[in-house]
Amino acid sequence: MSYTPIIKCDAVYKIFGANAEKMLQESNGNVDAKTFQDAGCIVGVNNASFEVAKGEMLVVMGLSGSGKSTLLRCISRLTDATAGKIFIEGQDLSALKNKELIELRRNKMGMVFQSFALLPHKTVLENIAFPLQIKGMKTEDSISKAMDMVKLVGLDGRENYFPRELSGGQQQRVGIARSLAVEPDIWFLDEPFSALDPLIRKEMQDEFLRLQGVLKKTITFITHDFDEALRLADRIAIMKEGIIEQLDTPANIVLNPATEYVRKFTQEVPREKVLRIESVMDPVDASEEVSEFKVHKDAIIETVAEAVLTERKPVAVLDENDNVVGTLHASHVIKVLYGGHAEK
């Protein structure tokens, strides 16, 4: 059985300007941003090709103007690409008629943006129910479904509040609940937490990870915050001037940067934030006595370091089936924290 990615981009370009298509054809796809800029064009996305698997969270990041939001708008076809192909579950977006595209967005896609865009005259419950009613769901059913979403994002008790009565973090929870109400398979999020205070942003990231653990959506998430990308991503794409400089796992992005630009982006990142236990564990030694405390092999070292360092004995490392696959010694954790990444 062949593999079909949920999202696939094949040589996607987005260039703004009157002569964009003509210049792109003449360049044979070899786009130089400076040359196009001198001709009055702006390169938003430059030859982007990648796939996103079912249930995967791809985080796209870069500085302002790098093209990350433009790429997201092309994937959702809020903006038409200048060239290239974009497929959603094997469907060519460019071949869809307007009605088909609307139905795809209504039934398959959820979107959350930095601006909460809540309707000020509607309550939390009414805001969440609104897209369901647009789809034709009966009012009673839409309210019931909206209440389920209220509980899912932890706002029960505030369902009758108006947006002005909520904090920024609570308003963004409403936006998330509203986007989830239609049960989308694909979730697009464009810097949803960047306007929030640091403590609230951390809370929302935790909530987001909890939701993803339950719902297993296919996600494309835009951010300019590298720490946020490290916390959330299965894979990270780093963009510069419309080009994807590197697309890889968080650990490989940090430990094996593909370009000088990526290296500068990641050089200050503590290794304990990206290295997983399996990269520093030892093989199982049947003669070795281990602690009762256990860790999973895919845990990030930073999240278990304190607990491991308080143990007097090595710690057993478990796989996804809770089988012991290795042991973790405190000395390896100390090396990661204070003396380099100590990969095996």
PLM ranges: what are they?
Residues 8, 25-34, 91-92, 133, ...:
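Conserved ABC ATPase "signature" region
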Residues 290-320, 327-344:
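The conserved cystathionine-beta-synthase
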Residues 84-92:
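Conserved ABC transporter NBD signature motif
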Residues 247-248, 256, 327:
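ABC ATPase "signature
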Residues 76:
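Helix-to-loop junction immediately C-terminal to a conserved catalytic motif
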Residues 162-166, 170:
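Conserved ABC ATPase signature
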Residues 181-185:
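A short, proline-enriched helix->beta-strand linker immediately N-terminal to the Walker B motif
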